[in-house]
Each structure stands twice: as structure tokens, then as C-alpha cells.
């Protein structure tokens, strides 16, 4: 496993200790997904992930490696090329890389995606994923849109950028959703009080010729192709 540190991010692990990462999958991908977000990780987001990944993939905001691990179980030969993990948290990178279990083909990049990521153009990817990342970033959705501009140079002309984010605006929330988002925003685990779906879609359309999006429950799912050069 190759490790690159492209930002001084080691101090950003307040909420990403080993115990929380162990608990994360059960709470986020089962309890919260089904009863709060109303968008199943297993039945909706995982098939979405599977349908968009390429042989040379970059996963941004890796969490515990839930989606990557699930892909490996279904497609043991994937990825055919290098797998690149990008995150702002060292523990998440280590957890995800160990869980995927292909150290010889995995590189970890510690970086802040709100800033340009200095990965060389010849290392462009067939696919880039942003699953449940944007709602954790600081700022309003209009500001977070620059993430797409920062990632676009890393994508091949034939590649796909795709992802999902939890919305606090422009969606109907049940009481459980409302309570969780209120708590998570209060402790800065989420920062999506000023996130609007239209802002994300507009930002994608500025950077890509083809953009698709859909809201399921309180989750915005999006994918973009044909990066504007």
C-alpha cells in the first residue's frame, strides 16, 4: 500500500476513532439509511455504486470502505488496475485500505478535496466516487461545488464521477431524520444546513456536459460524464 500525504490533516480525526468506525456500518448503512434517510445503502446506493465503477477507480471520502468491500465480495477481480483512496482522515484511509485487502494495488492519498489535488494527469481515473461526503464538508452547497472542479482533472474523458449526499433543505424529513441531522450539525459531524440540491446540480453542470441526479428520501444521488476541458 502506498501512502501520500498532500495536506496537514492528521488532526482531523476527532470523530473517526476505531470504535466509531466499527459502529459506523451498522448505524449509518442500516439503521440511519432505512429509518432516517429512507434510502437503503444495500438496495439503492450499492447497486448505484456497482453500476458506475471502472477498472481504475478513485474513492473520495472512504468512510470504512463499506462500498469498496461490497464490490470486492461481488467482483473479486476488481479493480483490474490501481485503487486510489482519498480522504481527510488518516484512520479512515487505513481502515478502508485494510478492509479492501489489496495492498499491492492500493494507494492512499491524505488530502483536502476543497483544494486542488496534485495527482498527475497521467494517473487519470475511469471513475471517481463521492459517497456521503459533501454533507460533511464545511461551507454552503454553493461553496462545496468547487469539489467537482478539483476532481474533474483527475477523470478521463470517458470517465464517470458519481456520488451521494444527505440533504437538509428541499426535502421532507421524518422526526428521526430531523433529530439526527440536528444533532450531527450541532457537533459538526454534518455541515449541511445550507446545502441545496440545485446548487450541487448547477455546479456539476458547469464542469460536465452530462449530469443526472435524483433524490430518494433525503439523499441526492448524482453522476456526471464528459468533463468540460
UniProtKB/Swiss-Prot annotation:
Pfam family, one: Methyltransf_12
InterPro entries, per the entry: Methyltransf_12 (IPR013217), MeTrfase_VrtF (IPR016584), SAM-dependent_MTases_sf (IPR029063)
Function: Methyltransferase; part of the gene cluster that mediates the biosynthesis of citreoviridin, an inhibitor of the of F1-ATPase beta-subunit. The HR-PKS ctvA accepts acetyl-CoA as the starter unit and catalyzes eight iterations of malonyl-CoA extension and four iterations of SAM-dependent methylation at C4, C12, C14, and C16. The KR and DH domains selectively act on the first six iterations to generate the hexaene chain.
Keyword Nucleus: no
Taxonomic path: Eukaryota, Fungi, Dikarya, Ascomycota, Pezizomycotina
Organism: Aspergillus terreus (strain NIH 2624 / FGSC A1156)
Any one GO BP annotation for this protein: methylation
Molecular-function GO terms, alphabetical: methyltransferase activity
Similarity comment: family membership: Belongs to the methyltransferase superfamily.
CDD domains assigned to the protein according to its UniProt record, in alphabetical order: AdoMet_MTases
Alphabetical keyword list: Methyltransferase, Transferase
E.C. designation(s): 2.1.1.-
Pathways involved: Mycotoxin biosynthesis
Practical and industrial applications: Citreoviridin inhibits mitochondrial oxidative phosphorylation by binding to the beta-subunit of F1-ATPase. Ectopic mitochondrial ATP synthase is a factor that mediates HIV-1 transfer between antigen-presenting cells (APCs) and CD4+ target cells, and citreoviridin can completely block antigen-presenting cell (APC)-mediated transfer of HIV-1 at the APC-target cells. Inhibition of Ectopic mitochondrial ATP synthase by citreoviridin can also lead to suppression of cancer growth by activating the unfolded protein response.
Gene3D superfamilies registered for this protein in UniProt: Vaccinia Virus protein VP39 (3.40.50.150)
Class of this enzyme: transferase
Protein name: Methyltransferase ctvB
Amino acid at each position: 500500500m502506498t501512502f501520500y500525504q498532500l495536506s496537514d490533516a492528521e488532526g482531523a480525526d476527532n470523530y473517526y476513532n476505531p470504535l466509531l468506525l466499527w459502529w459506523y456500518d451498522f448505524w449509518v448503512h442500516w439503521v440511519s439509511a432505512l429509518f432516517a434517510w429512507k434510502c437503503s445503502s444495500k438496495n439503492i446506493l450499492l447497486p448505484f455504486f456497482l453500476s458506475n465503477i471502472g477498472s481504475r477507480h478513485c474513492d473520495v471520502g472512504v468512510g470504512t470502505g463499506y462500498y469498496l468491500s461490497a464490490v470486492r465480495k461481488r467482483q473479486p477481480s476488481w479493480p483490474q488496475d490501481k485503487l486510489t483512496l482519498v480522504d481527510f482522515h488518516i484512520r479512515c484511509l487505513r481502515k478502508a485500505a485494510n478492509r479492501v485487502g489489496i495492498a499491492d494495488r492500493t494507494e492512499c492519498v491524505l488530502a483536502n478535496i476543497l483544494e486542488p489535488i496534485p495527482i498527475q494527469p497521467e494517473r487519470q481515473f475511469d471513475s471517481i466516487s463521492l459517497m456521503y461526503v459533501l454533507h460533511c464538508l464545511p461551507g454552503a452547497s454553493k461553496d462545496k461545488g468547487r469539489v467537482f472542479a478539483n476532481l474533474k482533472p483527475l477523470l478521463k474523458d470517458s470517465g464517470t464521477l458519481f456520488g451521494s449526499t444527505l440533504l437538509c433543505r428541499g426535502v421532507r424529513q421524518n422526526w428521526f431524520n430531523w433529530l439526527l441531522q440536528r444533532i450531527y450539525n450541532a457537533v459538526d459531524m454534518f455541515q449541511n444546513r445550507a446545502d441545496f440540491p440545485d446548487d450541487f446540480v448547477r455546479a456539476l453542470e458547469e464542469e460536465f456536459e452530462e449530469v443526472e441526479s435524483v433524490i430518494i428520501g433525503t439523499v441526492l444521488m448524482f453522476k456526471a460524464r464528459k468533463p468540460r476541458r
